[in-house]
């Protein structure tokens, strides 16, 4: 699965040699796990956890003014906590994924652009651990976490132009994952609020 994602991204990279921008994005994910069988953790309220986000992305102009296509390869950490005085749980997971979406340069005031964005991320787990009262278990092969996850997202960012080199940006995204093929009674939806800092460089056509 990881090889397929890498091959797809390489194809996109060659396809986007005429892209307008290449960007490097980092940020923080604030993640909440929504368990569809919460009775498993009765008396141990779930809490949001934080993790890192890294991405390289391309931005392409469309045939419509101000509307852009975006493609990216990213690594997301989705972590969460639960516990009380008797029991404690921790989840630490990392997902590698391909992202595609749209951005619209809604407002431009001097060197500042306000950009809403929407898209979807197709991701697969590359690392997964669960800690239960100090004991650590590998969950990367558990059906709730393994396989492909579809992660639609919605967000916005503010871009500030740095002369002719490109832009810096600060943004916010919200996403909720789902796995259509999963039939288990217990499965996990991952709800994430993401803060993103980006460096954007113009690419000559």
Give the positions of each predicted feature.
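Bacterial Sec-dependent N-terminal signal peptides
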Residues: 1-25, 112, 199-205
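Outer-envelope beta-barrel architecture signal
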Residues: 4, 20-22, 65-69, 110-116, ...
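A structural signal for short, well-ordered beta-strand segments
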Residues: 10, 26, 71, 118-120, ...
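Short glycine/proline- and aromatic-enriched beta-strand/turn motifs that initiate or cap beta-hairpins
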Residues: 19-65, 69, 200-205
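Residues that define the transmembrane beta-barrel architecture of outer-membrane proteins
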Residues: 20, 48-52, 75, 92-98, ...
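Flexible, solvent-exposed loop segments that connect beta-strands
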Residues: 33-46, 77-95, 126-146, 181-188, ...
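Gram-negative (and chloroplast) outer-membrane scaffold detector with strong preference
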Residues: 57-134, 193, 197-205
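Predominantly the C-terminal beta-signal and adjacent terminal strand-loop region
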Residues: 78, 144, 149-205
């Amino acid at each position: 699965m990881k090889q397929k994602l890498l091959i797809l991204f390489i194809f996109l990279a060659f396809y986007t040699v005429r892209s307008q921008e290449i960007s490097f994005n980092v940020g923080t994910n604030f993640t909440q796990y929504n368990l569809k069988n919460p009775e498993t953790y009765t008396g141990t309220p779930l809490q949001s956890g934080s993790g890192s986000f890294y991405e390289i992305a391309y931005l392409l102009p469309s045939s419509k003014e101000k509307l852009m296509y975006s493609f990216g390869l990213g690594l997301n950490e989705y972590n969460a906590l639960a516990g009380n005085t008797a029991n404690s749980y921790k989840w630490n997971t990392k997902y590698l994924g391909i992202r595609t979406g749209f951005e619209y340069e809604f407002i431009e005031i001097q060197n500042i652009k306000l950009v809403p964005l929407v898209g979807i991320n197709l991701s697969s787990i590359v690392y997964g651990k669960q800690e239960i009262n100090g004991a650590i278990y590998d969950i990367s092969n558990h059906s709730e976490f393994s396989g492909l996850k579809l992660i639609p997202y919605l967000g916005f960012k503010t871009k500030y132009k740095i002369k002719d080199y490109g832009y810096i940006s600060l943004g916010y995204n919200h996403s909720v994952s789902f796995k259509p093929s999963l039939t288990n009674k217990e499965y996990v939806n991952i709800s994430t609020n993401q803060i993103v800092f980006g460096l954007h460089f113009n690419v000559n056509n």
